[in-house]
């Protein structure tokens, strides 16, 4: 993964400005708020406001907001599960209770991050399923007729067993299929260009483009919504390309809200 690191004078930290991996790109555009914003949003219930971040006090508050329980209660639960609870039903009950413990996510939503992303159309189609707390504006080929870039995937085998989704290791003939894919996809792109040059409307010509062409979009959300996406898309059951993209997003967001990001993602 290629990363562009900048020094942020306002935050007095070095942070990731953009990431690129296998043709996919994520770039920082803007953000609002900090871990202190999360703290003050929580304190609003008591009519209070802090002017400086106090790690000794505020780290614990943010962890409590994300878990729905104090650090002491969390450690007690972990200790019981690890050393004291042996009955399978008791373990299942404790895990169910932890999973369904009411959390306090609203303070995290008083933040805002805007990113610019370049991904294959097939990956974009998965990302737009994340709707809660997000807004997306995508380059439209109704209006843009530039020659699209092509994503070259790593072709992997079907998963073993009865699993219907996902993929396994790199296919033994991956290089052959990459060559075939590139030849067919580039032919489709040339056809698209020829159709536009011949006077076909871009919104009609785009139907010949394959799922592997790149698209660009502006993506805005809060730290809680991005963390939810990160947790779901870094799971081993997700497609590898979207796992990679989620990690790229995390590289940019984590330095902006380090305590909140850790509390929400465990990173």
Q: Residues of each region from the PLM?
A:
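Family-specific signature for flavin-dependent thymidylate synthase
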Residues: 1-267
């Amino acid at each position: 993964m290629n990363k562009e690191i900048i020094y942020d004078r306002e935050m007095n930290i070095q942070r990731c400005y953009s990431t690129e991996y296998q043709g996919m790109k994520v770039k920082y555009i803007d953000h609002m708020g900090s871990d202190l914003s999360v703290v003050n949003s929580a304190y609003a219930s008591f009519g209070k406001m802090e002017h400086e971040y106090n790690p000794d006090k505020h780290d614990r508050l943010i962890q409590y907001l994300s878990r729905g329980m104090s650090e002491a209660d969390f450690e007690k639960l972990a200790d019981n599960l690890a050393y004291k609870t042996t009955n399978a039903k008791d373990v299942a009950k404790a895990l169910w209770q932890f999973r369904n413990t009411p959390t306090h996510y609203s303070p995290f939503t008083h933040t805002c991050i805007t990113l610019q992303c370049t991904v294959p159309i097939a990956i974009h189609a998965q990302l737009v399923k994340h709707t809660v707390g997000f807004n997306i504006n995508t380059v439209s080929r109704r209006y843009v007729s530039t020659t699209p870039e092509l994503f070259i995937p790593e072709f992997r085998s079907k998963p073993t067993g009865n699993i219907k989704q996902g993929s396994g290791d790199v296919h033994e003939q991956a290089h052959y299929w990459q060559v075939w894919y590139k030849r067919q996809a580039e032919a489709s792109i040339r056809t698209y260009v020829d159709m536009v040059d011949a006077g076909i409307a871009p919104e009609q010509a785009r139907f010949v483009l394959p799922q592997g062409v790149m698209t660009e979009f502006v993506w805005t959300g809060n730290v809680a919504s991005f963390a939810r996406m990160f947790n779901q898309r870094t799971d081993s059951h997700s497609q590898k390309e979207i796992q990679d993209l989620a990690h790229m997003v995390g590289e940019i967001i984590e330095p902006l809200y380090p305590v909140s990001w850790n509390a929400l993602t465990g990173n």
